[in-house]
Amino acid sequence: MQKIRKGDSVVVLSGKDKGRKGEVLKVMPKDEQALVSGINIVKRHQRQTQTQEAGIISKEAPIHLSNLAIADPKDGKPTRVGFRVEDGKKVRVAKRSGALIDG
């Protein structure tokens, strides 16, 4: 079971977006990276196609999972993730507050 999943609210721990929060759009486990909305924005020069115009577009670039932490459901601060078995199912738990992480 992954600690960070699509749809999770995360906090950036290091880099140019340190301290900012966003929602995980996509997780790439093989590369140990994730796409987070509004985080690690880069500009790409887009060549013209039949459907798109040419120009400079801004989009999210992947960020390494080690630079992300789950936001605690209670106070929004970064927390580590633990696991617990409840009703025969393995669930994620915030180490900071003990709250269950939805997902």
Curated annotation (Swiss-Prot):
Keywords linked to the UniProt accession: Ribonucleoprotein, Ribosomal protein, RNA-binding, rRNA-binding
Pfam families attached to this UniProt entry: KOW, ribosomal_L24
PROSITE patterns: RIBOSOMAL_L24
An example Gene Ontology molecular-function term: rRNA binding
Highest taxon of the lineage: Bacteria
GO CC aspect terms: ribonucleoprotein complex; ribosome
Record-level GO BP terms: translation
UniProt xrefs under InterPro entries: KOW, Rib_uL2_dom2, Ribosomal_uL24, Ribosomal_uL24_CS, Ribosomal_uL24_KOW, Translation_prot_SH3-like_sf
PANTHER family associated with the record: MITOCHONDRIAL RIBOSOMAL PROTEIN L24 (PTHR12903)
Subunit and interaction comment: Part of the 50S ribosomal subunit.
Family per similarity comment: Belongs to the universal ribosomal protein uL24 family.
Function: One of two assembly initiator proteins, it binds directly to the 5'-end of the 23S rRNA, where it nucleates assembly of the 50S subunit.
Entry protein name: Large ribosomal subunit protein uL24
Native species: Brucella canis (strain ATCC 23365 / NCTC 10854 / RM-666)
Lineage: Bacteria, Pseudomonadati, Pseudomonadota, Alphaproteobacteria, Hyphomicrobiales
